[in-house]
Every structure is written in C-alpha cells, then in structure tokens.
C-alpha cells in the first residue's frame, strides 16, 4: 500500500499508461510523490512505469485507510480511428462516466479524502490541428 512520500503527496492516476499519463507519472515521481496507478493490465503498466509506482487493477483493493491526496483521471477508451456506432458510444461513455463515478465513490469511502479530483479527456491536449491525423506521437 502506498504511503505518503516524504517530499510529496500520494496521487492516484488512471490512464497512466497513455501518452499524457506516462509523462505525468515521470513528473510526479521526480517531484517526490508516491503514485498509485489503476491499470487494466498491471503487467503492461509495470513495464511502462517501472517499480516505483503501486499498481492495482481494481479500486476495491484500496482500503479505506489508503492515503490519497489527489486523483488524476485520464482514463477513457480511445476515440479516434474506430467507427462511431451505438456500441462504441456506450463504451466511450462507460469508460469515462463509469470510471469517474467509481473514483468519486472511492473518495467518499476513504478516511483521508483526496483534496482534488482532476478529470481530463486527453484529446484536448493536441489542440485544433485541422484535418491532420493525430495519434499519441503527435505533439
């Protein structure tokens, strides 16, 4: 279980294996923060993020006494490159709204409640780029 880092805070991050998430993880570790990462694939997250972060695949594994100072929610199913079907829309909504609701519920059950929840959709990071095709390499 992550404990508050001596020189920083404990931050829970979803979407930590994406482009913005991996950069955020590096920055927060360099700052001295302790990190808890929620990942669908803990093995992949471990390979990408290293051994300095605590990785969980289920929020339920975090006990009520887990100290979390901040939550950063970058999770969400990929938007670009797939057909815009009814099923896809349901997946997109679930991956964003469902995850956000689960994080709010986690915060409510923690003894040490997070001071902030930041929830972001990473596609906005790229800005307006016209008809240019964007992926995680386009910065």
Where would I find each of the regions flagged by the language model?
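A short, basic/flexible loop-to-alpha-helix module at the beginning of a structural domain
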Residues: 1-8
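N-terminal Rossmann NAD(P)H-binding glycine-rich loop of SDR-like oxidoreductase domains
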Residues: 9-31
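SDR active-site strand-loop-helix element
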Residues: 14, 38, 71-75, 117-123
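Glycine/Thr-rich phosphate-binding loops of Rossmann-like dinucleotide-binding domains
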Residues: 21, 80-82, 126-128
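Conserved glycine-rich Rossmann-like NAD(P)H-binding loop of the short-chain dehydrogenase/reductase
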Residues: 33-40
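NAD(P)H-binding glycine-rich loop region in Rossmannoid oxidoreductase-like domains
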Residues: 44-102
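Conserved Rossmann-fold NAD(P)-dependent oxidoreductase catalytic core, especially the SDR/UDP-sugar
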Residues: 90, 101-139
């Amino acid at each position: 279980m992550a404990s508050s880092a001596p020189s920083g805070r404990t931050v829970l991050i979803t979407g930590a294996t994406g482009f913005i998430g991996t950069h955020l993880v590096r920055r927060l570790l360099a700052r001295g923060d302790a990190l808890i990462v929620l990942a669908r694939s803990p093995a992949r997250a471990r390979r990408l993020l290293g051994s300095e972060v605590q990785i969980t695949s289920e929020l339920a594994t975090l006990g009520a006494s887990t100290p979390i100072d901040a939550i950063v929610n970058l999770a969400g199913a990929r938007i670009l490159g797939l057909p815009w079907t009814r099923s896809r829309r349901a997946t997109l909504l679930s991956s964003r709204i469902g995850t956000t609701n689960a994080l709010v519920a986690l915060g409510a059950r923690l003894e040490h409640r997070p001071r902030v929840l930041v929830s972001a959709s990473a596609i906005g990071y790229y800005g307006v780029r016209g008809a240019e095709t964007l992926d995680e390499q386009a910065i």
